[in-house]
Amino acid sequence: MPHSYGYRARTRALFARAFKTNGPVHLSTYLTNFKIGEYVDVVGNAAVHKGMPFKYYHGRTGIVWNVTKRAIGVEINKRVRHRIIKKRIHVRIDHVKKSSCRDSFLKRVKENDKIKHDAHVAKLPVPSTKRLPVLPKAGAIIKSKGQVPETCHAIPYEHLV
């Protein structure tokens, strides 16, 4: 059993920085703009102790609900027994990065809008933009070029003892 149950207990590997990424924080971290409603990833940066999130929130994705001078408010879903609670925390900008969780969705929306616009311009009916599961492969005819196909059967089981 561990001796202490402190705020940062057992976070040696959790907050450890990756190989060759030690040292001061890059300026681009502070120049990033965050808007209310954006998705962000909470990732604790061990180089900056101020405004560091509690270890539970490390690696979680949330939505920005408040922006201040040096920190942003992030709303994160936390499962407590049988229910999910929305937790609102303030985290310094050093410990937050923009999430790429919606990139594929936004790309798909853009492509669908383009398809609909092109159909409208060409005065064609709007095609369905729903994603469909992959269908089974179509049947094919195999040519044997004069060779007779051989029928395979399972070998009957024989008791060898």
Curated annotation (Swiss-Prot):
Protein origin, superkingdom: Eukaryota
Gene3D superfamilies: 6.10.250.3260, Ribosomal protein L21
Keyword DNA-binding: no
InterPro entries reported for this sequence: Ribosomal_eL21 (IPR001147), Ribosomal_eL21_CS (IPR018259), Ribosomal_eL21_sf (IPR036948), Translation_prot_SH3-like_sf (IPR008991)
UniProt KW Phosphoprotein keyword: no
SUPFAM superfamilies xrefs: Translation proteins SH3-like domain
GO CC aspect terms: ribonucleoprotein complex; ribosome
UniProt record similarity statement: Belongs to the eukaryotic ribosomal protein eL21 family.
Stated name of the protein: Large ribosomal subunit protein eL21
Species assigned in the record: Cyanophora paradoxa
Annotated gene: RPL21
